[in-house]
Amino acid sequence: MEPAGLEQILKELLLPDTERIRRATEQLQTILRDPAALPALFDLLATATDSQIRQFAAVLTRRRLNNRWRRLAPEQRESLKSLVLTALQKETVHSVSVSLAQLSATIFRKEGLQGWPQFMNLLQHSTHSSHSPEKEVGLLLLSVVVSSQPEAFHAHQHELLQLLNETLSDVSFPGVLFYSLRTLTAIARYVRPDDVSLARMLVPKVVTALRTLIPLDEVKACEALEALDEMLETELPIINPHLSEVLTFCLEVAKNVALGEPLRVRVLCCLTFLVKVKSKALLKNRLVPPLLHALFPLMAAEPPMGQLDPEDQDSDDDDLEIGLMGETPKHFAVQVVDMLALHLPPEKLCPHVMPMLEEALRSEDPYQRKAGFLVLAVLSDGAGDHIRQRLLYPLLQIVCKGLDDPSQIVRNAALFALGQFSENLQPHISSYSEEVMPLLLSYLKSVPMGNTHHLAKACYALENFVENLGPKVQPYLPELMECMLQPLKNPSKARTKELAVSAIGAIATAAQDSLLPYFPTIMDLLREFLLTGHEDFHLVQIQSLETLGVLARALGESMKPLAEECCQLGLGLCIHIDDPDVRRCTYSLFAALSGLMGEGLGPYLPQITTLMLLSLRSTEGIVPQYDGISSFLLFDDDSEAEEEEELMDEDMEEEGDDSEISGYSVENAFFDEKEDTCTALGEISMNTCVAFLPFMDATFDEVYKLLECPHMNVRKSAYEALGQFCCALHKASQRSSSDPSSSPVLQTSLARVMPAYMQAVKVERERPVVMAVLESLTGVLRTCGSLALQPPGRLSELCNVLKAVLQKKTACQDAEEDDDEDDDQAEYDAMLLEHAGEAIPVLAATAGGHAFAPFFATFLPLLLCKTKQSCTVAEKSFAVGTLAESIQGLGTASAQFVSRLFPVLLNNAREADPEVRSNAIFGLGVLAEHGGCPAQDHFPKLLGLLLPLLARERHDRVRDNICGALARVLMASPVGKTEPQVLATLLRALPLKEDMEEWLTIGHLFSFLHQNNPEQVVDVASELLRICSLILPDNRIPPDTKAALLLLLTFLAKQHTDSFHTALGSLPNDKAQELQAMMGLT
């Protein structure tokens, strides 16, 4: 085919005439099937006079070669390689140079360094050229090729860093700077430790280069900022010596209102990431105050004259109704503060932020006050524990006062803050319901039902507060339900109905069975919404599905008669409505129903799992982002015959190789769908057990693939579901066989899941994912027991992983700084350690005390160092609690650790904080129980602590733990050494008030007394009868405890009749008669 004929067709495609473009497209698709078309394209990319035709030819050539390179004759390959390099050197139009560089990258991937030495020669020559346009082309080519195949350049990292140190030194040529930064973006993550000093030299040059690019091209500057992100993300401390300079640059750009918002937002995103990965370095270099001083004016910025922030506009856009949905510098500045709260110790952040916060809230400027409430909202997320313990009431009063602010924008922010407080400060905030609920109800009634924008904000705060109230919601239930049912029964906007349906779900979560009087009305309304075909009600339908699932969980058995109808409703909607949110909410409904129906859901599982597997596999919503011109995608000209031929070709090249795709964007709804699908599958597998087995293999494989998903929440949900699958398989194997170890499916699943969990803890960068993995790991160990510790060596691997978390040596922990000078940690860090700590006692119980003891010895110093006087309350509580539960798991093997544990637990039993005291006393009790002779030596000192403490202790849980500890001491005391006054003191302190689990211990004591020395209870008969009369009607007391006490009393009645009847006489008549009847003495 002649180049001129092909060129004419390509020209037709550039005309603004739809019909001519259609005909030319058909011609082109036909021509490109002819092998002779390729040489014509080669000729055009080098010689066509029109730059658009040259670019067209380069892109089409690249797409043709993706799967056909090896089919070209060797001389054709060599000819094209030479032609492309020549064309690159001659080309003067930048867009064509980019396409030629991309074509070169495709060829390079096929040939490699060895197969194309001329390419490396050109790179070497052009990137070091003194002629700037030639150097720019060389760096363009380098950036594209290194991005395309970074592993090919690993051996040349040092030379590349040296080159970039040179090219970034001259700020005269923006193109050279831009492509130098793009190259750095591609190689930064591969920098080796011995090149750190060279990489550090680049940081000031990167900042200077960015400063040079910003006034010239903000779009390119945004793209070039990725180099900074990559340098921050590497585990090596490249940025640290220049952290102040980088921070100053970012803040300068963020504050500069003359610059475009996309660039300022992009820089604030970079700052957010910097805070996340360099929080300790920020503290060490005293950079937090200047950062906050720069952020507050950004957060308080007033929008342009006559405008409002997006979330304050009376817009019909539901996404802007609640919280921080805007894409402005203001909203991203708040996110930086959120990240500071998550990653800095509150003791270090709050002294800096609180004075600025108070000043903002006192300001006459409503935007200053708004900023104050937004900061309060995000502080409750990262510094929640600190606020709960020290600041909750005064801050809550400030927020409540904000609901009466004269400015609507401030009231909006106060509602958002109250919603965040309600979400993050549980359970403490619920104790203020008598103050908060009347305010919220009053505010809700003051908003006109038609004003859905403000109504949404009020409902957000109300829902978050109400759903955690439990029984405390009952006084407000009639008023709440009247508010919610009124717009549902009467004509109102669809959005108003959606908000009311959502609020009913939150109310149901709190009210539980108290909602039953309203249930028939609610169900009639939800049915109506779910069966309507009206398009305006689509979002009401979605919310109705979600609320139906909440009702199934809240009302339990009362909902059971409707379970099958709900199942059919959900399936019908999924089949007839193609919408990710409908599917997501339906799957959550199925999960809730599985809790009611159990294996009764079995007949529906084929349809349910088919739908869910389609959701897991779907690539819907995933949109490729192309570097080239999108119209070139029209010419994906492989005919069906060619595709079949390629499938048969043994030498077929990689299918997925498309250098035109620069990345993917995914609509959030589809990520949410995958996340909720995983969550629902995990729950359904647990609840339906054996009925789920036929679907286990397919669902397991699809969920496992999502461990590689780029979206954090999907990965988190996938890890959780895999753990639930293992637990479900264990449960099913117990049902079908007495020995779960005989289940090959369970063994295979554990063999895949446990290594995946350990790998995730080590390399996953997102803390919420790691916390979920640790929690799931603990659950699998607890359920599957020793099977989860196969093969041999697994116990050691698991202990090493947990130890890495405690030592802050995992990828998600900021541990590159020295921690010696400061033991404070962010609450987010502490939560991660707690999740690891919870696995240690479970490991001990699973492995067996004697097998675990050597590993516990390595955990012990890491836990003991968190019990020092200088540690925070949260750290002490965590460490002491972990030690206490580990002693239980170790059993008799704990005897060898008594000398190290007893003094620490004794000291912490005197702590001011009741939670620390409670944990320490529990630990002393279990150490007394299991510690054998070494522990018995400490009994006099232990009783010397516990008995006086019981007399003055005012916290119910601590008193209950003292009772449990005394019971354990009595059972563990050497025969004949039990002191009667200890037993009498213990019995006088009963019944337990809060820690009901300790009734098991008290029950064991009653059995122990009956079996070993029943005579000693004669003197305390009246106390035993008093306790019995109180606990017999209490359903919270374990039946075994009641039975053990009745046995003791029966012994008394038979062997010491006088003492028994004297004691019985001290009870009220009705109690005495009830007791005699239960003992068969009447």
From Swiss-Prot:
It is found in: Cytoplasm; Nucleus. InterPro entries: ARM-like (IPR011989), ARM-type_fold (IPR016024), HEAT (IPR000357), Importin-beta_N (IPR001494), Importin_beta (IPR040122). Gene3D superfamilies: Leucine-rich Repeat Variant (1.25.10.10). Disulfide bonds: none annotated. Its main location: cytoplasm. GO terms for cellular component: chromatin; cytoplasm; nucleus; protein-containing complex. HEAT repeats lie at residues 348-385, 390-427, 431-471, 475-513, 896-933, 937-975. GO terms for molecular function: nuclear import signal receptor activity; nuclear localization sequence binding; small GTPase binding. It comes from the Eukaryota. SMART domains: IBN_N. GO terms for biological process: protein import into nucleus; ribosome biogenesis. Residues 24-90 form the Importin N-terminal domain. The keyword Cytoplasm applies. The modification N-acetylmethionine is found at M1. Keywords: Acetylation, Cytoplasm, Nucleus, Protein transport, Repeat, Transport. Belongs to the importin beta family. Found in a cytosolic complex with ASF1 (ASF1A or ASF1B) and histones H3 and H4. Nuclear transport receptor that mediates nuclear import of proteins, such as histones, RPS3A, TNP2 and VDR. Serves as receptor for nuclear localization signals (NLS) in cargo substrates. Is thought to mediate docking of the importin/substrate complex to the nuclear pore complex (NPC) through binding to nucleoporin and the complex is subsequently translocated through the pore by an energy requiring, Ran-dependent mechanism. This is Importin-4. It comes from Mus musculus.
